[in-house]
């Protein structure tokens, strides 16, 4: 035990009441932090960091916490909130809590009770807590009536996270992140979302939720094996009136999504990705193309496109009813195409593509591509194509260079 204090020792109690920061690292035999009898005297703690305390079973936390980071505590199964008044009921509010990180807590099943509020929470990181099926505890009504149980949703519809800006959920057994009927302001300030190694995740954005993410700037999806579509645009609840889809998104990275077949299950009816700058698609083996020609017109600010190790990709931009457009990716600066065995060309539709800012092209192991485009491509700043990390080739334009590479595979 860390604080094994007799409640009659006034000087020790006075010091404990002044404690506002507690950092515990590498204490493998620590089983308890404080006596249960005096735990309420530990209620002014604002910063709590606990790492590698393998034997710690329960953890008391105060309501005035600002930062909580718990890592590699294998025996920890419960977090207990200290109330100023014993027997207090009703909602518990963490009015100052801004950052929460829960990592490698294999036995943690309860992080917070159902009646809890986080009006200031900005950053939440949860990684490898396999027993934690939901962020807050189930209500008694859900426990008594299984038909009301929304346990498939990691964030229940009763929880509001209206200040959350950064969310990491990694290596969690979660099927659905958020309930479509969660509070209307919840997640509306989210700027960065990272979902990694969530092997049961079925979807990310439903039609009722996607309208909330107007501030999202960075989206990373990695190793979510059951994820077949990122954006579900129909089939959940009626969509809200929306003028743009993800208008502030600047970086989209998707990798190792083995079942991903498309971005969305229905053609978007509103403009999307208007501020997207960087797009990275890696090891998505069921994708055959990225966008249709008309869809690609939305990506007017795209500067970097990296498409690698996608076994079934045949073209980057798919045919779109014979439409010819000359303004695809006008801001493009860097294009990387690597390990795409079935890629035939960038786009099969005719028309002159104008890429006045393109400066870097890297290609490697694209054996099926005979020419980059059917027609001309204007790239005034492009002077070479990287065919290895350092080796370059150039025959006057991109089409001729790609064609030469196809006819001379050992180049």
Model-derived regions: residue spans:
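Cross-kingdom leucine-rich repeat
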Residues: 1-411
